Amino acid sequence: FNRYNKENQEVSKIAEKQLFDYRQKNPGSCFANTEFSLDVNTAYILQDKITKLRLNDGEKIIGYKVGCTGSGTKQQFGIDGPIRGTLFDTEQLKNGTSLSLENFCRLSIEGEMAIKIDTDGGIHSVFPVIELHNFIFRGAQKTLSELIGNNGINAGIILPQKEFFNSRTYLNKRANLYININNNNVGNAELWPLPGGPVASLNWLKKNLNQYNLKLLPGHIVLAGTAAGLYPVKKGDRIEVYIN
């Protein structure tokens, strides 16, 4: 019991430091320490402790992300997911929002599909989003633990126009998702990164949440991951994500 208590206190301390760093736009500094390492389970416990701190500060969970699923990000990171991250109300932005680079650390974006959860825990609708990231790994080698402990390097999401929120058009229809930066196509991929489509991402997430006594609620948004990559953005860039 004492050992567990001590470990629990240590993870709580790391959680406070992680949240402080994140808010200072200097995320994950503890991973720069070569002596520092976490296993995947402890990384999720850390993520959930940071979430509790954010909830105590008045933020709300609006859903989760399933990350590191597609060939693009797997290749970029050199690691195999999936992993789970947590989404917050303070970081959901409207279509057409202007961002300030100073509010991020190496801002990069993904275009991907999101799932809105129905009252029965199934899929209410699906629509494209832009996911924002602080694209930084500090460990000598990229690890799933660092990715999870930094909340899947998520830094927010940009939602589409309201008319998409109830759309089921692309639930079973095949199409591609395109990412444009300054009217140049930088990447495109099939809508869903896992062979089983949106249901596969959702089932994996439900299983993961269940392991940590968490669950999806009606209205939650789930980012299903992307088969494309992560794209760095510069000052003045205009980003568009669309389905064709």
Positions of PLM-derived features:
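Catalytic-core "active-site belt" of small-molecule-metabolizing enzymes
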Residues: 4-197, 202, 211, 238
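Short, charged beta-turn/beta-strand-edge "cap" motif at the junction between a beta-strand
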Residues: 227-231
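Short basic/hydrophobic patches in alpha-helices and adjacent helix-turn junctions
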Residues: 204-214, 221
